[in-house]
Structures are given as C-alpha cells and as structure tokens.
Amino acid sequence: MTDLAELGETIKAALPAAVSNASIAFGELTLTVDAAKIVEVVRFLRDDPRCRFISPIDVTAVDYPGRANRFDVVWHFLSPSLNTRIRLRAEASETTQVPSLIDLFPGVDWFEREAYDLYGVIFTGHPDMRRILTDYGFDGHPLRKDFPLSGFVEVRYDDDEKRVVYEPVRLNQEFRKFDFLSPWEGADYPLPGDEKRSE
C-alpha cells in the first residue's frame, strides 16, 4: 500500500478515537493525533503489516504562542519497506505531559530530551528527562517564540577568576534592521544565479 491517501484512511479507520485528521502535504502523510494516545498510534504504525513504520527519524515541536495549546509536538517515522515517511502531530499546552515513546523506540531518547530542553515539552515515562543541549542552570527554553533573541545571560570565560562566569547580556549596539526593498526598483532585483533561470 503506497497510496498515501489510502494509507491515511486505513489508519484513521483503525484508530478512530486517536487520529482526527489525515492530510498530504509535500508528498508526505500527516496525521493529527490525540497526544494522550500517541503510544497506541505509534504501536499500530510499527506493528501493522500495512504500515511497518519501524524507524523514528525525529521528534520536535512547533511553538504557536497565540494558541491555548501552544505546541504541536511532531514525530517523523520512516517505513523502509513502503519507502514512505509519515508525520504525526499532536497539540500540547505548557502543562500537558506527552507520553514517551522510549519503550517502543529506545532511539527517541535524545530526541525527546531535545524537545524538552528547547521547547519545554514534558514526556512522561522518560527515564532521564533533563537538558541535553543547554547548560545545567539555563533559564527558559530557547526555541520558544517568546524567548528573547539575545537570551538572558552571557556566558564567558573570565581570565582573572579562571572560570566560566554568567553575566547579564550587554548589547554594545542596538539590533539593526536591514531593509533590502528599494523604493526605486521594488523587490524584483536580480540575484546571483538568476541569469541561469529559464524564462
């Protein structure tokens, strides 16, 4: 079964309480799932002979600060036998705890830790839910859209104290805004390589 629309309908029919939507974008099937039922969905995708999504590719999140459930937790899987990828999306709030997939796929360990570290998404049942990319005492989650661009503190090595020190961020100049729109030429200016483009 390689037809994505047919595969999406098959999965929706098998898991009607867990899968609310199936859509195809850019040649990839996307399922909208209930976050609380993610383990059930992924177990089906792994074990069902029509699916065989046996390889987790990534776990990440997308931040929509204007929504009540501000995060979309996103999982990507690959079925080598079908030569097909699938994307699972589930909404979560800052306090929603999403079940971990580590019992089904031990390889998602660092993916889930990264999503926790950078977005603050908490995965229940994960044996080692701690930061993986930022420093131990790091304040906040840097990929959230409300995190300041310059961060909260500056980390540097102090030669006098012979250790790493944390200081408030000092900006020596204001952020600059580069406006490339020419009032005379508009935005249709030639870019390098445009001469190779066929008309």
From Swiss-Prot:
Catalytic activity, EC: 7.1.1.-
Database matches in InterPro entries: NADH_DH_suC, NADH_quin_OxRdtase_su_C/D-like, NADH_UbQ_OxRdtase_30kDa_su, NADH_UbQ_OxRdtase_CS
Root EC class: translocase
Chemical reaction(s) catalysed: a quinone + NADH + 5 H(+)(in) = a quinol + NAD(+) + 4 H(+)(out)
UniProt GO cellular component terms: plasma membrane
A GO molecular function held by the record: NADH:ubiquinone reductase (non-electrogenic) activity
Signal peptide: none
Record keywords, A-Z: Cell inner membrane, Cell membrane, Membrane, NAD, Quinone, Translocase, Transport, Ubiquinone
Membrane topology type: Peripheral membrane protein
Keyword Cell membrane belongs to the record: yes
Pfam families: Complex1_30kDa
Compartmental location: Cell inner membrane
Function: NDH-1 shuttles electrons from NADH, via FMN and iron-sulfur (Fe-S) centers, to quinones in the respiratory chain. The immediate electron acceptor for the enzyme in this species is believed to be ubiquinone. Couples the redox reaction to proton translocation (for every two electrons transferred, four hydrogen ions are translocated across the cytoplasmic membrane), and thus conserves the redox energy in a proton gradient.
Subunit structure: NDH-1 is composed of 14 different subunits. Subunits NuoB, C, D, E, F, and G constitute the peripheral sector of the complex.
Family: Belongs to the complex I 30 kDa subunit family.
Protein name: NADH-quinone oxidoreductase subunit C
Biological classification of the source: Bacteria, Pseudomonadati, Pseudomonadota, Alphaproteobacteria, Hyphomicrobiales
